[in-house]
Amino acid sequence: MWEEPCISGTRGSGAVFFSGCGLRCVFCQNERISQKGEGKQVTPKRLSEIFRELEEQGAHNINLVTAAHFVPAVLDALALYRPNLPIVYNSSGYESVETLRMLDGAVDIYLPDYKYIDPNMAAMLSGARDYPDVAHAAIAEMVRQTGAPVYDENGMMMRGTLIRHLVLPGLTGDSIRILERICDDFPGIPVSLMGQYTPCGRALTMPGMDRKIRKKEYARVLAYMEAVGLDGYRQELGAADGAFIP
């Protein structure tokens, strides 16, 4: 799986996708997995074997994608086999602190989204009016567990939290407010500023959400990120692979 350079490196991240999601994003690109339950059932033993196989294939880390509702099974699998690799918890940010505390000591890297700061937008676009407060509390817990980011000699993240934010069309003001809050509340935590929003699914029928973001929209948010000195990654708009640049 391709992620930010400090996660994907040269050999890729060993992604394990879990069916289902607590959000109902109108622009979700993985609806078959997140909302329609596509996937196959595996036991904790088989999951532990998948971890081993990804390790043997050379993955830089084990990347657990939307695993919140399978945390007990994930912990059982890690008890059976703990790879000698960082464990990445790849999250929408819509997580309970109680669930995250179960992962304390098991997860090395948290990769949460920080999608919304406006409850009305969170309700309209993801069906979760409480997302801003829930995500902020969740990220605070993630940062508490991991502390400041730690990298190896090749720039690979070995421990830490990397916050992702996707700029949405017409909502640059909200994006700037999110970056401001990250700067104030999570100093030293890197941010991945994403610009690859692609209208799909229900978003195609929603005025304002039925287009990609404009370069000037992304540029405005990026300029703020640079002005306040937030460390992290930006995305090259229009690049075939949506490449991230440190």
Residue ranges: model-predicted function:
Residues 77-88, 137-142, 215-223:
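Alpha-helix-loop-beta-strand connector modules within alpha/beta enzyme cores
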Residues 147-246:
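Auxiliary Fe-S-binding modules of radical SAM enzymes
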Residues 34, 71, 94-96, 114-132, ...:
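Conserved radical SAM core fold
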Residues 1-110, 118-120:
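Conserved Radical SAM active-site core
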Residues 55-77, 124, 130, 140, ...:
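Conserved glycine-rich "GG(E/T)P / GGGxP" loop and the immediately following alpha-helix
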Residues 122-154:
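Anionic-ligand binding region
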Residues 14, 62, 87-89, 110-112, ...:
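Hydrophobic faces of well-ordered beta-strands that scaffold small-molecule active sites
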Residues 47, 74, 100, 135, ...:
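Aromatic/hydrophobic pocket-lining residues that form the small-molecule binding cavity
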